[in-house]
């Protein structure tokens, strides 16, 4: 039930009994789909609140390489972070290895052991060449991650500047690879998705699958080449009268 413009958890708004009964909390920053990011203090608060309980935390750090305004913090850098949390990393985004399904988790040893046990019973293993490629990427391509981040930051800046100029309402993307655009008056997310596809040949993701508060937003990927993104931006800004008319 998170709301713009920060999309950060407020534990005080959750029923204490619900928190007491909660076994697992799943956080993801930079956030998909909203593009919001967390500060270290957000993780500090979460760890301090749950470190003496039976509740554990999983932080999905798939978009760790993409932090445009500040460096993305790790929950494991919080005091006692490793006592209560694990962090999940993916090579799909930062290293352009989508489809290879390569990732890893670090953190709380008991959670890692449980994950290892589950993995042993559900997965026969990964093709060795993919593991070798992933290992090589991790050991040799830190500079590439910097370039990736700069590429997406530039796309974000250009895209948002055009939306702002046309007075289209959006949530400022602080990290990740998506933009979170509000729908025009009279449209929910699925209706606007259909409209954009049929009338503008633009494919977006409706916000409703991400929760009911996403019903008046659509997710737009910045993972396009500059020419495609420029064309899509022009088609979107042509709709300014739908928002401002």
Model regions and ranges:
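Active-site phosphate-binding strand-loop segment of PLP-dependent enzymes
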Residues: 3-72
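PLP-dependent enzyme catalytic core of the Aspartate aminotransferase-like
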Residues: 15, 186, 195-204, 210-245
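Helix C-cap/helix->beta junction micro-motif
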Residues: 52-53, 166, 200, 243
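Conserved core segment of the aminotransferase class I/II
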Residues: 78, 82-153, 157, 161, ...
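Residue-level recognition of strand-loop junctions within catalytic nucleotide-signaling folds
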Residues: 108-109, 139, 182-184, 223-225
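Conserved glycine-rich beta-strand-loop-beta hairpin in the small C-terminal domain of fold type I
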Residues: 135, 151-160, 170-182, 214
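A short linear hydrophobic-aromatic micro-motif
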Residues: 166-170, 203-208
């Amino acid at each position: 039930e998170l709301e713009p413009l920060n999309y950060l958890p407020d534990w005080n708004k959750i029923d204490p009994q619900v928190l007491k009964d909660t076994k697992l909390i799943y956080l993801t920053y930079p956030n998909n789909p909203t593009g919001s990011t967390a500060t270290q203090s957000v993780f500090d608060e979460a760890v301090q609140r749950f470190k003496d309980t039976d509740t554990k935390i999983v932080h999905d750090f798939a978009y760790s390489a993409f932090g445009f305004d500040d460096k993305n913090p790790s929950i494991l850098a919080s005091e006692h972070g490793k006592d209560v949390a694990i962090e999940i990393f993916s090579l799909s985004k930062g290293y352009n290895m989508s489809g290879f399904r390569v990732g890893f988790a670090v953190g709380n040893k008991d959670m890692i052991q449980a994950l290892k046990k589950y993995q042993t019973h559900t997965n026969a293993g990964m093709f060795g060449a993919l593991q070798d490629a992933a290992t090589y990427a991790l050991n040799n391509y830190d500079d590439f991650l910097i370039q990736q981040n700069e590429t997406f930051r530039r796309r974000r800046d250009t895209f948002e500047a055009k939306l702002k100029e046309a007075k289209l309402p959006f949530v400022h993307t602080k990290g990740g690879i998506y933009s979170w655009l509000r729908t025009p008056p009279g449209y929910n997310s699925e209706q606007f998705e259909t409209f954009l596809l049929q009338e503008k040949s633009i494919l977006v993701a409706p916000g409703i699958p991400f929760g009911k508060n996403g019903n008046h937003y659509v997710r737009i990927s910045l993972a396009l080449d500059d020419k495609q993104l420029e064309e899509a931006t022009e088609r979107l800004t042509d709709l300014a009268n739908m928002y401002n008319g």
